[in-house]
Amino acid sequence: MELRAVRGMNDILPEEVERWHKLEGAFRLHAELHGYAEVRTPLLEPTELFRHQMGETTDVVEKEMYSFERHGDHLTVRPEGTAGAARAYVEHAVHAKEPVTRWYYLGPMFRGERPAKGRYRQFYQAGCELFGDPGPLCDAETIDLVAGFLQRIGVGEFVVHVNSLGSAGTRERYREALLAHYTPRKAELSEDSQRRLEKNPLRILDSKDQRDHEVSRDAPSILDLLDDADRAHWDGVRRCLDVLGVNYVVDRSLVRGLDYYTRTLFEVKATAGDLGAQSTLAGGGRYDAMVAGLGGPSVPAIGFAMGMERLLTMMPGASPRRRPGCFLAPLGQSGADQALVLAKQLRALGVPVELDGRGGRLKAMLRRADSLGARLCVILGDAEIERGVLQIKDLVAHVQEEIPLEGAARVLADRALEAPPGGQRGAR
């Protein structure tokens, strides 16, 4: 029986992992430059956490979560990172330790979506969460953080879509306005949207069904219903975005797919590339009621997440696999024994090493060293070991020499780590 990876879940092989390392490293650096520290939360959370915070009528909760019951506990493999971060913030009473908290995370998420280009059932997200700052300046800086990161990794063609959902009173007025708009045309809506109409008509705006798009085309805008405080906040966000020079558009139809958002929300969409319908690179917004909803104090918060697979498709160029600085080619038992010791010494000095322990012919080992892009091939034959020497073949300069076995590790390390002629090989 042939076993394959679960549909929508992919293996990431070594030739691709280097690109992932590059992307993850760039995100860590960028987040830490903005004062964020890494947090790691469990893959499994109580199912109620997501049902309560993301919304019972959202597609994620209704159709896409991987949930199960074990020993009386109802558990879900996390579909996103914000709810878990907020749960950790409350559980560890972080609010009592610092007035403003900035966290970032990277890791896998899981949703039972229909797989498509740039959309998977196991996917990786990088995100930031900021607790404790309610102001529009904070919102604009968060959006600018995302835009700056995309520019850092070479994704230059994108635009930020922004909207405001207001506070609770504004959303209630908007709910009534949407009911008045949709109810006379209920029969034209999809079955899912007809069912959601009374409970949460905002979800209709986020529907992917073309029938709902048609009915929503002339739906009222929440921006027309903002109260004075929400209006001042919204104006402040746009003013700060203008100051920062962020390329953005006001998108009155933007609501995103989760119920916990308040006031500012945003999506970053690619304007070039081959993502098709999956053009959203990042998204987020403010969720000022979540911490209190989890039993904590009233703490404002804002965050975002980015799909890393989509970012990788947009990043220019490919990262080569890390090459060994030294390839050790032992010939005979004494050579093999000495190669084990030498490899350990070189690695302790920071040199990537590959040791060929198959006991093959020298010609085959040289071909292997060359195919790996090694800088040096070190030949350890029994006769050379008996004389206290070893052979070095420089695969860039195409020269071969003999050096004493004693002190060889330091000599090899210096050679392997120096910049080669042309800069084509060697350890990175």
Swiss-Prot record:
GO CC terms of this entry: cytoplasm
Pfam families in the record: HGTP_anticodon, tRNA-synt_His
EC number: 6.1.1.21
EC class name: ligase
Superkingdom classification of source: Bacteria
Record keyword Kinase present: no
Keywords annotated in UniProt: Aminoacyl-tRNA synthetase, ATP-binding, Cytoplasm, Ligase, Nucleotide-binding, Protein biosynthesis
UniProt key word Cytoplasm: yes
PANTHER family (UniProt xref): HISTIDINE--TRNA LIGASE, MITOCHONDRIAL-RELATED, HISTIDYL-TRNA SYNTHETASE
Name of the protein in question: Histidine--tRNA ligase
UniProt gene name: hisS
